[in-house]
Amino acid sequence: MTVDRQALGFGYGEHAAYASNPWASRGRLYPEASSPTRSDFQRDRDRIVHTTAFRRLKHKTQVFIAADGDHYRTRLTHTIEVAQIARALARALNLDEDLAEGVALVHDFGHTPFGHTGEDALDEVLKPYGGFDHNAQSLRIVTKLERRYAEFDGLNLTWESLEGLVKHNGPLTTADGQGLRGPVSQPILDYCALHDLELASFASLEAQVAAIADDIAYNTHDIDDGLRAGYLTFEMLEEIPFLARLMYEVRDRYPGLESSRFTHEIMRRQITAMVEDVIGVSQRGLADVRPASARDVRCAGRVIATFSDEMSETDRQIKNLLMTRIYRHPEVMRVREGAASIVTDLYRAFMDDPSLMKEHYWIDQIAGMEEPARARHVGDYLAGMTDTFAISVHRRLFDHTPDLR
Protein backbone atom coordinates (compact mmCIF):
# COMPACT_ATOMS: atom_id res chain seq x y z
CA MET A 1 0.00 0.00 0.00
CA THR A 2 1.37 3.43 -0.94
CA VAL A 3 1.53 6.05 1.82
CA ASP A 4 1.29 9.78 1.09
CA ARG A 5 3.92 11.16 3.46
CA GLN A 6 2.98 14.79 2.98
CA ALA A 7 -0.64 14.02 3.77
CA LEU A 8 0.47 12.34 6.99
CA GLY A 9 2.69 15.26 7.92
CA PHE A 10 5.50 13.12 9.33
CA GLY A 11 8.66 15.21 9.37
CA TYR A 12 7.21 17.78 7.01
CA GLY A 13 6.52 20.57 9.49
CA GLU A 14 7.79 24.07 8.86
CA HIS A 15 11.58 23.85 8.84
CA ALA A 16 13.89 26.80 8.38
CA ALA A 17 16.55 26.58 5.67
CA TYR A 18 19.22 26.23 8.38
CA ALA A 19 17.44 23.31 10.08
CA SER A 20 18.59 19.72 9.67
CA ASN A 21 16.55 18.02 6.98
CA PRO A 22 15.58 14.41 7.77
CA TRP A 23 14.95 13.74 4.09
CA ALA A 24 18.50 14.83 3.22
CA SER A 25 20.28 13.00 6.04
CA ARG A 26 23.88 11.95 5.54
CA GLY A 27 22.70 8.46 6.28
CA ARG A 28 23.48 5.58 8.59
CA LEU A 29 26.62 3.48 8.86
CA TYR A 30 24.56 0.49 7.71
CA PRO A 31 22.14 1.56 4.95
CA GLU A 32 18.45 1.00 5.65
CA ALA A 33 15.30 1.60 3.65
CA SER A 34 13.35 4.70 4.68
CA SER A 35 10.11 4.35 6.63
CA PRO A 36 6.90 5.37 4.84
CA THR A 37 5.45 6.85 8.04
CA ARG A 38 8.40 8.25 10.03
CA SER A 39 11.32 10.49 9.18
CA ASP A 40 14.83 9.21 9.84
CA PHE A 41 15.13 11.47 12.88
CA GLN A 42 11.83 10.20 14.27
CA ARG A 43 13.12 6.65 13.94
CA ASP A 44 16.31 7.63 15.77
CA ARG A 45 14.34 9.12 18.63
CA ASP A 46 12.10 6.06 18.83
CA ARG A 47 15.06 3.68 18.86
CA ILE A 48 16.66 5.67 21.67
CA VAL A 49 13.52 5.50 23.83
CA HIS A 50 13.20 1.72 23.42
CA THR A 51 16.72 0.90 24.61
CA THR A 52 17.73 -0.76 27.84
CA ALA A 53 20.17 2.13 28.35
CA PHE A 54 17.23 4.56 28.45
CA ARG A 55 15.37 2.45 30.99
CA ARG A 56 18.46 2.19 33.21
CA LEU A 57 18.50 5.98 33.62
CA LYS A 58 15.56 5.56 36.01
CA HIS A 59 17.89 4.22 38.70
CA LYS A 60 20.94 6.39 38.09
CA THR A 61 21.74 9.36 40.29
CA GLN A 62 21.50 12.96 39.17
CA VAL A 63 22.83 14.68 42.31
CA PHE A 64 21.15 12.97 45.26
CA ILE A 65 21.33 9.22 45.72
CA ALA A 66 18.03 7.96 44.38
CA ALA A 67 17.33 5.83 47.45
CA ASP A 68 17.19 8.98 49.60
CA GLY A 69 13.75 9.92 48.28
CA ASP A 70 11.33 9.33 45.44
CA HIS A 71 10.84 13.02 44.62
CA TYR A 72 14.44 13.86 43.67
CA ARG A 73 15.54 13.85 40.05
CA THR A 74 17.22 10.85 38.49
CA ARG A 75 19.05 10.70 35.17
CA LEU A 76 15.77 9.68 33.56
CA THR A 77 13.67 12.54 34.90
CA HIS A 78 16.48 14.97 34.06
CA THR A 79 16.66 13.59 30.53
CA ILE A 80 12.92 13.98 30.01
CA GLU A 81 13.07 17.58 31.24
CA VAL A 82 15.98 18.34 28.90
CA ALA A 83 14.10 16.81 25.97
CA GLN A 84 11.02 18.91 26.69
CA ILE A 85 13.03 22.14 26.79
CA ALA A 86 15.02 21.17 23.68
CA ARG A 87 11.85 20.46 21.74
CA ALA A 88 10.34 23.81 22.78
CA LEU A 89 13.47 25.65 21.62
CA ALA A 90 13.53 23.70 18.35
CA ARG A 91 9.91 24.56 17.65
CA ALA A 92 10.49 28.26 18.35
CA LEU A 93 13.44 28.33 15.93
CA ASN A 94 11.77 26.18 13.24
CA LEU A 95 14.27 23.36 13.66
CA ASP A 96 13.71 19.62 13.43
CA GLU A 97 12.10 18.84 16.78
CA ASP A 98 12.70 15.09 16.53
CA LEU A 99 16.45 15.48 16.09
CA ALA A 100 16.69 17.96 18.97
CA GLU A 101 14.65 15.67 21.19
CA GLY A 102 16.66 12.60 20.19
CA VAL A 103 19.99 14.24 21.04
CA ALA A 104 18.55 15.36 24.38
CA LEU A 105 17.26 11.86 25.17
CA VAL A 106 20.56 10.14 24.39
CA HIS A 107 23.02 12.66 25.83
CA ASP A 108 23.35 10.98 29.25
CA PHE A 109 23.38 7.32 28.18
CA GLY A 110 27.05 6.93 29.07
CA HIS A 111 26.82 8.11 32.66
CA THR A 112 27.94 5.67 35.31
CA PRO A 113 26.10 4.84 38.52
CA PHE A 114 26.43 7.57 41.17
CA GLY A 115 26.72 10.44 38.70
CA HIS A 116 30.00 12.27 38.23
CA THR A 117 31.42 10.56 41.31
CA GLY A 118 31.12 7.18 39.61
CA GLU A 119 32.58 8.58 36.41
CA ASP A 120 35.60 10.02 38.23
CA ALA A 121 36.22 6.72 40.01
CA LEU A 122 35.94 4.70 36.80
CA ASP A 123 38.15 7.16 34.94
CA GLU A 124 40.80 6.79 37.63
CA VAL A 125 40.99 2.98 37.46
CA LEU A 126 40.88 3.02 33.64
CA LYS A 127 43.57 5.68 33.24
CA PRO A 128 46.23 3.12 32.18
CA TYR A 129 43.88 2.08 29.35
CA GLY A 130 42.72 5.47 28.09
CA GLY A 131 40.44 6.54 30.92
CA PHE A 132 36.67 6.90 30.88
CA ASP A 133 34.51 9.64 29.35
CA HIS A 134 30.72 9.49 29.57
CA ASN A 135 30.26 11.15 26.17
CA ALA A 136 32.43 8.55 24.46
CA GLN A 137 30.60 5.85 26.42
CA SER A 138 27.27 7.16 25.11
CA LEU A 139 28.64 6.69 21.60
CA ARG A 140 29.80 3.14 22.43
CA ILE A 141 26.35 2.29 23.72
CA VAL A 142 24.46 3.44 20.62
CA THR A 143 27.01 2.10 18.12
CA LYS A 144 28.06 -1.14 19.77
CA LEU A 145 26.80 -2.13 23.22
CA GLU A 146 23.04 -2.08 22.60
CA ARG A 147 22.45 -5.43 20.91
CA ARG A 148 18.87 -5.53 19.66
CA TYR A 149 18.91 -5.73 15.89
CA ALA A 150 19.60 -8.74 13.70
CA GLU A 151 21.75 -6.91 11.15
CA PHE A 152 24.01 -4.70 13.27
CA ASP A 153 25.21 -3.86 16.77
CA GLY A 154 24.05 -0.60 18.30
CA LEU A 155 21.11 1.44 17.04
CA ASN A 156 22.49 2.45 13.63
CA LEU A 157 21.46 6.07 14.21
CA THR A 158 21.79 8.70 11.51
CA TRP A 159 24.95 10.73 11.08
CA GLU A 160 23.14 13.80 12.40
CA SER A 161 22.07 12.13 15.65
CA LEU A 162 25.55 10.76 16.31
CA GLU A 163 27.17 14.08 15.44
CA GLY A 164 24.81 15.80 17.88
CA LEU A 165 25.61 13.28 20.59
CA VAL A 166 29.36 13.68 20.21
CA LYS A 167 29.57 17.44 19.51
CA HIS A 168 26.58 19.01 21.29
CA ASN A 169 29.01 20.90 23.54
CA GLY A 170 31.08 22.14 20.61
CA PRO A 171 33.91 20.98 18.35
CA LEU A 172 36.34 18.44 19.77
CA THR A 173 39.37 19.21 17.62
CA THR A 174 41.11 21.94 15.67
CA ALA A 175 41.15 21.78 11.88
CA ASP A 176 44.43 19.82 12.04
CA GLY A 177 43.04 17.27 14.48
CA GLN A 178 44.43 18.55 17.78
CA GLY A 179 42.10 18.03 20.74
CA LEU A 180 40.54 21.27 21.98
CA ARG A 181 39.89 19.96 25.50
CA GLY A 182 42.60 17.36 25.76
CA PRO A 183 42.97 14.17 23.72
CA VAL A 184 39.83 12.93 22.02
CA SER A 185 38.60 9.65 23.51
CA GLN A 186 39.59 6.61 21.48
CA PRO A 187 36.02 5.29 21.01
CA ILE A 188 35.13 8.54 19.24
CA LEU A 189 38.22 8.39 17.03
CA ASP A 190 37.53 4.73 16.24
CA TYR A 191 33.98 5.47 15.12
CA CYS A 192 35.04 8.51 13.10
CA ALA A 193 37.43 6.29 11.15
CA LEU A 194 34.32 4.48 9.88
CA HIS A 195 31.83 7.35 9.74
CA ASP A 196 33.50 10.77 9.96
CA LEU A 197 31.60 13.03 12.37
CA GLU A 198 33.74 16.07 11.45
CA LEU A 199 35.03 16.76 14.94
CA ALA A 200 36.46 20.19 14.05
CA SER A 201 33.12 21.75 13.11
CA PHE A 202 30.22 22.89 15.26
CA ALA A 203 27.14 20.71 15.58
CA SER A 204 23.70 21.38 14.14
CA LEU A 205 21.38 23.89 15.76
CA GLU A 206 19.29 20.97 16.96
CA ALA A 207 22.27 19.67 18.95
CA GLN A 208 23.04 23.17 20.20
CA VAL A 209 19.54 23.63 21.63
CA ALA A 210 19.80 20.21 23.29
CA ALA A 211 23.04 21.32 24.97
CA ILE A 212 21.66 24.61 26.28
CA ALA A 213 18.47 22.83 27.38
CA ASP A 214 20.69 20.62 29.55
CA ASP A 215 22.06 23.72 31.30
CA ILE A 216 18.59 25.16 31.82
CA ALA A 217 17.27 21.91 33.28
CA TYR A 218 20.28 21.49 35.58
CA ASN A 219 20.09 25.04 36.92
CA THR A 220 16.42 24.76 37.68
CA HIS A 221 15.91 21.29 39.06
CA ASP A 222 19.06 21.22 41.19
CA ILE A 223 17.75 24.32 42.97
CA ASP A 224 14.39 22.60 43.41
CA ASP A 225 16.00 19.43 44.79
CA GLY A 226 18.38 21.48 46.96
CA LEU A 227 15.48 23.32 48.58
CA ARG A 228 13.63 20.04 49.11
CA ALA A 229 16.68 18.47 50.78
CA GLY A 230 17.29 21.49 53.01
CA TYR A 231 20.70 22.28 51.50
CA LEU A 232 19.41 25.56 50.06
CA THR A 233 17.22 28.27 51.55
CA PHE A 234 15.26 31.06 49.92
CA GLU A 235 17.67 33.51 51.55
CA MET A 236 20.55 31.88 49.66
CA LEU A 237 18.67 32.22 46.39
CA GLU A 238 18.12 35.92 47.01
CA GLU A 239 21.89 36.45 46.82
CA ILE A 240 21.55 36.02 43.04
CA PRO A 241 19.89 39.14 41.52
CA PHE A 242 18.06 37.19 38.79
CA LEU A 243 16.47 34.82 41.32
CA ALA A 244 15.77 37.66 43.75
CA ARG A 245 13.74 39.43 41.03
CA LEU A 246 11.73 36.28 40.37
CA MET A 247 11.06 35.80 44.07
CA TYR A 248 9.90 39.41 44.44
CA GLU A 249 7.56 38.96 41.49
CA VAL A 250 6.01 35.80 42.97
CA ARG A 251 5.65 37.30 46.46
CA ASP A 252 4.08 40.43 45.02
CA ARG A 253 1.52 38.47 43.02
CA TYR A 254 0.86 35.68 45.54
CA PRO A 255 1.44 37.00 49.08
CA GLY A 256 1.58 34.29 51.73
CA LEU A 257 1.99 31.45 49.22
CA GLU A 258 2.99 28.12 50.78
CA SER A 259 6.60 27.04 50.31
CA SER A 260 6.11 24.26 47.74
CA ARG A 261 3.96 26.42 45.48
CA PHE A 262 6.33 29.35 45.94
CA THR A 263 9.24 27.17 44.80
CA HIS A 264 7.35 25.97 41.74
CA GLU A 265 6.40 29.50 40.71
CA ILE A 266 10.07 30.53 40.90
CA MET A 267 11.23 27.51 38.92
CA ARG A 268 8.70 27.90 36.11
CA ARG A 269 9.63 31.57 35.74
CA GLN A 270 13.31 30.67 35.71
CA ILE A 271 12.82 28.16 32.89
CA THR A 272 10.69 30.60 30.90
CA ALA A 273 13.19 33.44 31.27
CA MET A 274 16.14 31.26 30.25
CA VAL A 275 14.31 29.74 27.28
CA GLU A 276 13.22 33.17 26.04
CA ASP A 277 16.77 34.46 26.48
CA VAL A 278 18.16 31.63 24.32
CA ILE A 279 15.51 32.22 21.65
CA GLY A 280 16.34 35.92 21.46
CA VAL A 281 20.10 35.34 21.31
CA SER A 282 19.64 32.61 18.69
CA GLN A 283 17.49 34.85 16.52
CA ARG A 284 20.12 37.59 16.64
CA GLY A 285 22.85 35.07 15.89
CA LEU A 286 20.95 33.74 12.90
CA ALA A 287 20.47 37.29 11.63
CA ASP A 288 24.23 37.86 11.90
CA VAL A 289 25.38 34.58 10.37
CA ARG A 290 22.50 34.28 7.86
CA PRO A 291 22.92 30.51 7.35
CA ALA A 292 21.19 29.14 4.27
CA SER A 293 21.66 25.50 5.29
CA ALA A 294 22.55 23.26 8.20
CA ARG A 295 26.03 23.11 6.73
CA ASP A 296 26.35 26.88 7.14
CA VAL A 297 25.51 26.48 10.83
CA ARG A 298 28.32 23.95 11.25
CA CYS A 299 30.78 26.26 9.50
CA ALA A 300 29.71 29.42 11.36
CA GLY A 301 32.71 29.23 13.69
CA ARG A 302 30.56 30.00 16.74
CA VAL A 303 27.70 28.72 18.86
CA ILE A 304 24.40 30.26 17.80
CA ALA A 305 22.01 28.85 20.41
CA THR A 306 23.34 30.15 23.72
CA PHE A 307 22.72 32.56 26.60
CA SER A 308 23.13 36.32 26.48
CA ASP A 309 26.07 37.80 28.42
CA GLU A 310 23.71 38.77 31.24
CA MET A 311 22.13 35.32 31.45
CA SER A 312 25.57 33.68 31.19
CA GLU A 313 26.56 35.59 34.32
CA THR A 314 23.39 34.38 36.03
CA ASP A 315 24.23 30.84 34.91
CA ARG A 316 27.70 31.22 36.44
CA GLN A 317 26.26 32.50 39.73
CA ILE A 318 23.75 29.66 39.96
CA LYS A 319 26.40 27.03 39.22
CA ASN A 320 28.63 28.54 41.91
CA LEU A 321 25.76 28.43 44.42
CA LEU A 322 25.02 24.80 43.56
CA MET A 323 28.69 23.86 43.85
CA THR A 324 29.25 25.47 47.24
CA ARG A 325 25.91 24.66 48.85
CA ILE A 326 24.98 21.28 47.34
CA TYR A 327 27.72 19.43 45.46
CA ARG A 328 30.26 20.13 48.25
CA HIS A 329 27.81 19.74 51.12
CA PRO A 330 29.32 17.42 53.78
CA GLU A 331 26.47 14.92 53.48
CA VAL A 332 26.76 14.80 49.68
CA MET A 333 30.54 14.44 49.96
CA ARG A 334 30.11 11.59 52.44
CA VAL A 335 27.82 9.74 50.06
CA ARG A 336 30.19 10.45 47.16
CA GLU A 337 33.11 8.86 49.00
CA GLY A 338 31.12 5.71 49.59
CA ALA A 339 29.95 5.62 45.98
CA ALA A 340 33.51 5.98 44.66
CA SER A 341 34.61 3.07 46.84
CA ILE A 342 31.83 0.88 45.45
CA VAL A 343 32.91 1.52 41.85
CA THR A 344 36.60 0.96 42.62
CA ASP A 345 35.94 -2.22 44.61
CA LEU A 346 33.74 -3.70 41.90
CA TYR A 347 36.24 -2.90 39.15
CA ARG A 348 39.05 -4.69 40.97
CA ALA A 349 36.84 -7.65 41.82
CA PHE A 350 35.65 -8.10 38.22
CA MET A 351 39.17 -7.76 36.83
CA ASP A 352 40.40 -10.44 39.23
CA ASP A 353 37.44 -12.76 38.62
CA PRO A 354 35.19 -11.97 35.61
CA SER A 355 32.78 -14.74 36.64
CA LEU A 356 31.55 -12.43 39.41
CA MET A 357 29.76 -10.39 36.75
CA LYS A 358 27.25 -13.26 36.47
CA GLU A 359 25.89 -12.38 33.02
CA HIS A 360 27.23 -15.00 30.60
CA TYR A 361 27.62 -12.54 27.73
CA TRP A 362 30.18 -10.46 29.59
CA ILE A 363 32.04 -13.48 30.94
CA ASP A 364 32.24 -15.09 27.48
CA GLN A 365 33.46 -11.84 25.91
CA ILE A 366 36.28 -11.39 28.40
CA ALA A 367 37.62 -14.95 28.19
CA GLY A 368 41.08 -14.89 26.65
CA MET A 369 41.30 -11.10 26.34
CA GLU A 370 44.47 -9.14 26.97
CA GLU A 371 44.32 -6.84 30.00
CA PRO A 372 43.54 -3.55 28.16
CA ALA A 373 40.55 -5.08 26.36
CA ARG A 374 39.42 -6.82 29.54
CA ALA A 375 39.59 -3.53 31.44
CA ARG A 376 37.47 -1.79 28.82
CA HIS A 377 34.83 -4.53 28.94
CA VAL A 378 34.72 -4.39 32.73
CA GLY A 379 34.35 -0.63 32.39
CA ASP A 380 31.42 -1.11 29.99
CA TYR A 381 29.74 -3.45 32.46
CA LEU A 382 30.27 -1.11 35.40
CA ALA A 383 29.14 1.97 33.48
CA GLY A 384 25.90 0.22 32.60
CA MET A 385 25.06 -0.53 36.21
CA THR A 386 22.35 1.43 37.99
CA ASP A 387 22.97 2.80 41.47
CA THR A 388 20.71 0.18 43.03
CA PHE A 389 22.32 -2.71 41.15
CA ALA A 390 25.86 -1.55 41.97
CA ILE A 391 24.98 -1.26 45.67
CA SER A 392 23.35 -4.70 45.62
CA VAL A 393 26.31 -6.41 43.93
CA HIS A 394 28.80 -4.66 46.21
CA ARG A 395 26.84 -5.78 49.26
CA ARG A 396 26.79 -9.35 47.95
CA LEU A 397 30.53 -9.40 47.31
CA PHE A 398 31.89 -7.35 50.20
CA ASP A 399 29.33 -7.29 53.01
CA HIS A 400 29.76 -10.54 54.89
CA THR A 401 26.84 -9.98 57.24
CA PRO A 402 24.72 -13.15 56.95
CA ASP A 403 21.40 -12.70 55.20
CA LEU A 404 19.41 -14.26 52.39
CA ARG A 405 21.37 -13.48 49.22
Curated annotation (Swiss-Prot):
UniProt key word Hydrolase: yes
Taxonomy, superkingdom: Bacteria
One Pfam family, short name: HD_assoc
Keywords, ordered alphabetically: Hydrolase
GO molecular function, one term: triphosphoric monoester hydrolase activity
CDD domains (alphabetical): HDc
Residue ranges annotated for the HD domain, each copy included: 75-219
Keyword Hydrolase: yes
Transmembrane regions listed in the UniProt entry: none
InterPro entries recorded: dGTPase, Diverse_Catalytic_Enzymes, dNTPase_2, HD/PDEase_dom, HD_domain, PHydrolase_assoc_dom
NCBIfam families documented for this protein: dGTP_triPase, PRK01286.1-1, PRK01286.1-3
Record-stated family: Belongs to the dGTPase family. Type 2 subfamily.
Protein name stated in the entry: Deoxyguanosinetriphosphate triphosphohydrolase-like protein
